[in-house]
A protein has these predicted regions:
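The feature captures the beta-strand-to-loop junction immediately N-terminal to the Walker
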Residues: 37-39
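Catalytic Walker B motif of ABC-type/P-loop ATPase nucleotide-binding domains
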Residues: 153-157
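Helix-to-loop junction immediately C-terminal to a conserved catalytic motif
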Residues: 52
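Conserved ABC transporter NBD signature motif
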Residues: 60-76
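Conserved ABC ATPase "signature" region
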Residues: 109-124
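A short, flexible loop at the N-terminus of ABC-type nucleotide-binding domains that lies
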Residues: 1-6, 10-23, 28-35
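Conserved ABC ATPase signature
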Residues: 128-132, 136
Length: 176
């Protein structure tokens, strides 16, 4: 399994001073669980966006398995913050989880069912996202992330909107 290395990342939103990130370096080893902790506005989501390849740093380099991230993005999956998504979009749970899959073969259907079962929402597969609770939406996002063939998973506030027992279940799923 490849590791992800970020070296001296700097990122600014237009002419923002100081930059959102300034010379940040880190190494994510295979099989580890790492948490980014800090106050709101500290740049955690910005860093995750860079590490996933959604944005490019102004300076610095990101590699996965020794190769530039741009050539190896399939190794990295991002579960975005729940609040950053438009939950009124008319789509079902299974539609969200399978979104972006090129073919919907029998194996894709089996993977979909396994992902929904793994996060405990297979009974909600046909329900629209806007009819779900915040915690159920969070589980749908995790199922979508788990459908990804990546080896590195970046989760942005994965336990928001979850009650304490659900947080514990969620962390068990993530550790697996």
């Amino acid at each position: 399994m490849p590791c992800l290395i970020a070296e001296n990342l700097t990122y600014s939103y237009s002419t923002q001073i100081p930059p959102a990130l300034n010379k940040v370096s880190l190494k994510l080893e295979p099989g580890t669980l790492t948490a980014l902790v800090g106050p709101n506005g500290a740049g955690k989501s910005t860093l995750l966006s860079l590490l996933q390849g959604s944005s490019r740093p102004d300076q610095g380099e990101i590699t996965v398995g020794g190769k530039p991230l741009i050539n190896n993005r399939a190794q990295v999956a991002l579960m975005p913050q729940r609040g950053k998504l438009n939950w009124s979009f008319p789509i079902t749970v299974e539609g969200l989880v399978s979104l972006g899959r090129v073919n919907h073969s029998k194996s894709t259907c089996c993977e979909l069912e396994a992902a929904l079962q793994r996060v405990g929402i297979s009974h909600l597969a046909k329900r629209r996202l806007d009819s779900l609770s915040g915690g159920q939406q969070q589980r749908a996002l995790l199922a979508k992330t788990l459908m990804n063939p990546a080896n590195i998973f970046l989760l942005d506030e994965p336990c928001s909107a979850l009650d304490p027992p659900a947080k514990e279940d969620f962390l068990i799923i993530i550790r697996q």
